[in-house]
Amino acid sequence: MPERKEKGQVSVGAAEDRGKKGHSEKKDKRKQEENQEELHQLEEMRERLIRRIGIHGADEKVLKAMLRVPRHLFVPEYAKKGAYIDTPLEIGFGQTISAPHMVAIMCDLLELSEGLKVLEIGAGSGYNAAVMGELVGKSGHVYTVERIEPLVDFARENLKKAGYENVTVLLDDGSMGYSKCAPYDRIVVTCAAPDIPEPLLEQLKPGGIMIIPVGDYIQELVRIKKDPEGKIHEEKRGGVVFVPLIGKYGF
């Protein structure tokens, strides 16, 4: 004969279910609080990093753009804790994400502003493109070319997660530029070339600026300006260390 329940009595099974639910809710709440705390810590670390870079004279506009870009969303999970250290970080396939101070230097030299069309060679994780996306705004656009397919997917995922709709990641040989959307107001190369690739010079608008590391073991950052008549002017801006540009006009 089934056991009769008194009014208000709860079965053992129901009590256990309620207990499990309560425990799960507490666990979820604790996890949410931990995530919020981690996010707060990362934001504080980002602010400290940008302040340190600013001490060395980086442009205020560039610093503000970098402050808006969550670098921790552009590194592999294992490198997240080092996202706001001013150093390059490995992102796999023998590639790195540039040190933040170098991102600031290159963006300064590019003289980026609202509405410009930019070509980047070497998308990597998408971080540099995101910073440039902030600087050119919604009326501008950044096209970034990457030869390693898994990194193309990684960069696209990161940029989507961070909310950048004015950046397009392309799978191609970056040493040849991207003629379909040429000419460009600005071109930046985030890997070292043996010489300045002719297709990139051709795809740079008159009045445009290109930044490119040139060299093998000894590399120099070169700033190129194309005057309104199409004449090229080069200026060396100091020694750097970048991964090599691979492709038809690379190593």
Swiss-Prot record:
Annotated region (Disordered), positions in chain:
1-39
Record's GO cellular component terms: cytoplasm
Q: Which organism is it from?
A: Methanosarcina acetivorans (strain ATCC 35395 / DSM 2834 / JCM 12185 / C2A)
- Statement: the UniProt record of this protein carries the keyword Glycoprotein: no
| Enzyme Commission code(s) on record | 2.1.1.77
Q: Does the keyword Cytoplasm apply?
A: yes
Q: Which residues form the active site?
A: S98
- Family, as annotated: Belongs to the methyltransferase superfamily. L-isoaspartyl/D-aspartyl protein methyltransferase family.
The reaction(s) this protein catalyses: [protein]-L-isoaspartate + S-adenosyl-L-methionine = [protein]-L-isoaspartate alpha-methyl ester + S-adenosyl-L-homocysteine
Name assigned to this protein: Protein-L-isoaspartate O-methyltransferase 1
